[in-house]
Amino acid sequence: MKIVSFILILVSLLLFACNDDAKDENSRLDNQLNTKAAELASQFLIIDTHIDVPYRLEDNWEDISEKTEKGHFDYPRAKSGGLNAAFMSIYIPAKYEETGGGKDLADRLINLVEDIVAKNPDKFKIALSTEDVRKNFDNGIISFPLGMENGTPIEGQINNVKYFYDRGIRYITLAHSKSNHLSDSSYDEDKHWNGLSKFGEIVVREMNRLGIIVDVSHLSDSSFYDVLKVSAAPVIASHSSCRFFTEGWERNMNDEMIKKLAEYGGIIMINFGSSFIDNEFRLKREDWKKQLKEWEETHKLQDNDTRTQEYINQHSEKYMQKAVNVSQVVDHIDHVVNLVGIDYVGFGSDFDGVTDTPIGLEDVSKYPNIIYELLKRNYTDEEIEKICSGNLLRVWKEVEDVSNRIQLNED
């Protein structure tokens, strides 16, 4: 009996030792992956096609050349995360389609970005081309290409497309949360055009001619397919994710749309917002927004009433308990790769636009965490570089080439 007990104790000790060895080995491998992820983030050019810094700063100014208290983007965090090119979103709320003034707001936001660059020439530079992005990367400067979120500032004047090209805009999201004079919106139940308007088609062709990327994020499904019929160049979804994980939500792209996007040479840039990534989180968030609206209406509160913020602080947690993490964001990247291949996906975080960032992707310092997750899933260095920037640069260069061919044929 004593011998049996001794043997059992010995076996237990050996098992504990093996478990400890396995844990040590896993920890060692994990550390290696983290180290490599950080190295690749500093080595590769990383592009994010949608960061809402301008609108964030217009009413709540902070110096993003230094560490800021608020927001997701500033220079120190961008450098820490390896972000080299951040498309500054010139975001125009949907209400300006009705009220007017969208063009003026776009000008103010572009001016704001230009002022930041002028005051910090050693840190930031506006990028007008793929060549600019590569040159700035080589010089250690963060590129600010400009994308206009909402075509409302075109204001029915085709010459305004050229106007915004000259101001530095290199992609235009045709609509936002409401249908406008160019296109129907995915969020809007009142579809005006059943796709693109006739003027929207003219605008897409003019964007092709000038070398402005057409962005299909926020568009209705019908509008997306209309864009593919009209555009002579590949298009992007600058900040969308996969509807496969958020069933029935038109703001994300379904599998057939992603296949068509890839067939036409385009790319989907994955949005990091938790509502875009996880359906349970999205539905809870919708319930919370409904509850908040009902509470405001019951108490007859005006916009920006301080009592609303107090209510949010007191009650939001119980509605928003589910946490989304960086691994789930990479699930979306995986889904696109498995569906259409490695060449059609990238980063479109929506930082400073979304508030519900995942654990491990809290701000622009966290891109190495995505690379770490990709390494864990056996993505090669070459594949990771394509996701970080290569795919987007390919599409942008093709848009530039299409523009050159069109203008050459005009001469």
Each PLM stretch: what is its role?
Residues 194-202:
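Active-site glycine-rich loop that binds ribose-phosphate moieties when present
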Residues 234-240:
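Short hydrophobic/aromatic-enriched beta-strand-loop microsegments
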